[in-house]
Amino acid sequence: MTNTQKNKIKKIAEHFRNSLKFPKVLSKSGAELLFDNDLFTALFRERFGVYSENKEAFNAAFQAVTEGVGQEITKINSVVSSALLPLLVFYKLYIPKEGISIILKVGGETKKFTRAFFEVRNKVIGRPSCVDVALVSSDGNTILFLESKLTEMFEDATTEKEYGSSYKDLYMQSGIRSALNNRRIAIVEEATNLILKSEQPQYLEGIKQSISHLIGLVKGPQDTQDQSEYINAYNHAERLIYTPILYDPTHILSKHDNEYSNYHSLYSDVIGTHGNAILDAIKKWVKKSNGKKIVIEQSPLTYQKLTQENPDWLDERVKTFYGL
């Protein structure tokens, strides 16, 4: 679009706004808005009891979550939004402050994390993989990558998933094939595209997503200006840790939690148990090793465990809402 065309659009927007004498509100890119973004975030801050001293961090984190390539702005208004949950849990770390940190037992040790990035983009094939949260340790040596799950395993348990042909060669390598076979997930060899088949309905997308995130950890961040701080953190870190973080609904569903427990064990059986073999296959496939130590957690982290290890971390209304 040329500058002349941009100016024409700008003139139309000004005409609309002036017709009802709306105040002038601009986005970061200079486009005219009907409402200040803070009006929208204020509703979330009020509903979940975000204190005024955390307003700046919440607003900035909200923007990072909702303006990502995942189009989370269309999803965050759901009561069971998978975008909202990590935002409410980790937003305080988006703008680092002295004395603000959480403690987690990951990678075989207890680490303090003082910085959070949302929707970080790493190179995979074509489109990047977007990891929900990346937590940076206080010493900058470790980044913990978290893929948040709330109800996805209920919505997308299936016996078959099809993906593009560009992934086929990677998945045909013995390290990944044996990992999938551990849960009787087969690859349709005669197909051009990658087709995963399972005897029983399972959350196959969660496994494919984890493997894509691991590719991204090996290949590194997508080089864009809006990720400069994350890129600096990635380059500085010596160790990268990956795990899903799940919301455990068993206190709500009691005995009817098969999908949750199935995915918890699915991740452990495929990714957790065979993590090193999967990483070796990825490094061979991309013909690259970034020199960083990549650690894959054996079992998923849960929001319940995070809360137990950090009992005073969450805002009270957030704890009540999610039963944490």
Where are these regions (language model features)?
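Acidic, metal/cofactor-coordinating or nucleic-acid-engaging core segments within structured domains
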Residues: 155-243
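Short acidic loop-to-beta-strand element that houses the catalytic metal-binding Asp/Glu
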Residues: 128-136
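A short, conserved, highly charged catalytic patch centered on acidic carboxylates
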Residues: 133, 149-160
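Active-site beta-strand-loop-beta-strand hairpin of nuclease catalytic cores
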Residues: 135-145
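Non-catalytic C-terminal interaction segments of nucleic acid-processing enzymes
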Residues: 211, 215-324
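Nuclease-adjacent, charged terminal/linker segments that flank catalytic cores
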Residues: 1-119, 324
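Short, solvent-exposed loop/turn segments at secondary-structure junctions
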Residues: 118-125, 149-153, 221, 247-252
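A short catalytic or substrate-binding loop motif that flags glycine-/basic-rich loops and adjacent residues
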Residues: 81-83, 124-128
